[in-house]
Structure formats: C-alpha cells, structure tokens
Amino acid sequence: NMDNLAEGIDFAHAHGKKIFVASNIMPHNSKLKTYLKDMRPVVEMGPDALIMSDPGLIMMVKDEFPDMPIHLSVQANTMNWASVKFWQRAGIERVILSRELSLDEVAEIRQQCPDMELEVFVHGSLCIAYSGRCLLSGYINKRDPNQGTCTNSCRWKYDAHEAKEGDNGDLIPVARDSSADAVEQFEPTTDLGLGDPTDKVYLLQEETRPGEYMPAYEDEHGTYIMNSKDLRAIQHVHRLAEMGVDSLKIEGRTKSHYYAARTA
C-alpha cells in the first residue's frame, strides 16, 4: 500500500540506495482518467525514477511532473539502437533493453548510444509471447511473426508421444498409441505433492512433421508446455560490465525477498 511504499523509499534513501517505482502498464482508455491523480502521491514520495513503457503515459507524466526521471521498461521491447536514440530524444534517462537481445546486439547499442544509461536483465523468467511476437512460428519454421511471416503454428494439430530419457540424456519416443487422447491426463488430487515424482516426458509432434519432436516435461505438479527456461546470464556479467552496461537487473516481481536477495 501507499504507506509501505513511502516507508520503503525513505528506508532506501536513508541507506544511500535508490528506488525506482514500476508503472509500466499499457493502459486502456478507462485507466487514463485517474492515472495522474493516482500517481501524484507516489511522485511526491520522491522515488528516484519511474519505470514506464507506454508512450502516452510517459507524455502525460513528463507534462505533469517534468522533473521526475523516467526509465523505459523492458516491456517497451527496445530491440535496437535507433529505438534507444528515439527514447533519448524523448527525455528518457535509462532504457531497460529487451531480454531477447544477444550480447553482440547489446554491445552495438552501447557503441551507438554512448550517452544513454542501459540496463540489462541477467536473471529471471522469459515471456512466451507478446502480441505479434509469438515464439512458435520462429521456433518451428524460423519465420518471425513480427516480420510479417507468421505461419500460425498455434493453429496446427499436434500429437503427444510418451518418451523416456536414454543413458546419454537423449529423449527416446516410447512405442505406443501416439494420439493425444491416449496420453494420460494429469488430474490434481488431495495427495498432490506426496510420493515419488513422476518425471514423465512427452514429445509433441506436428502432424506434417513426422519425427520432429518438441519435449514437454511432467512432474508431480503437472505438465509444463509453456514454461521456458529461465534467463541465467551470470557467466556474461563480466562482459556486460566491460561493454559499459550501467545496470544489471534481476527479476523480482512475484518472487520472494529471499529469492531476490540470494540471486543478487
């Protein structure tokens, strides 16, 4: 609540630390009506910056609170140095770059935008999709939906094959009825979490691509079809520092204080 936020800002400043308040929603019209009124008490608490993504809200905040520093959120999906220059001209003080960039792309942005503060995620979950940027078409067909070449992979038919892990770690399909209806469905029970984990593996196969399998793992909690591996860039921190990245970001939203502290 607002009291906790004010206390947190005062606590951080008393210990010589900065605190940035995330306000990175992409609002519908209805939320614009009260946005500035709702944000005024937050701004008056004196955070060191607002993390924002929507161009309209950024414009409104800069008009109403011209002295409030603004950092561009990762949710603005900044992918290239031209976009960074655009936001720099708009008065943004720091850009949190898209998590989908390679190290070489980050280095090029740093080279092209030497005067802009850059922040990079080095740990946390990765989103599966953004409107017009679904990963399926790019993963299966190497055709990027955002480049106008989406193959609508989400609408294709997929069969599920049970698999086992070989001695060398390879996944081997199990000879059995491969229709999706034949796969045992996970049903939660009152003893969920008790007993040995199932550790099952299923391979998804698109009907026009026989023999091309995509793994989906199941344990005692369920099946994780949409669960990407977390970003873990600790091995690249030294290079990021050398190229001049100003800040490294660890995902904290929906995570415990313990998780964030131990990761840091």
Indicate residue ranges for each PLM-predicted region.
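Active-site pocket-lining/capping segments in soluble small-molecule metabolic enzymes
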Residues: N1-T78, I96-L97, D104-S247, T254-A264
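As written
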Residues: G91-I92
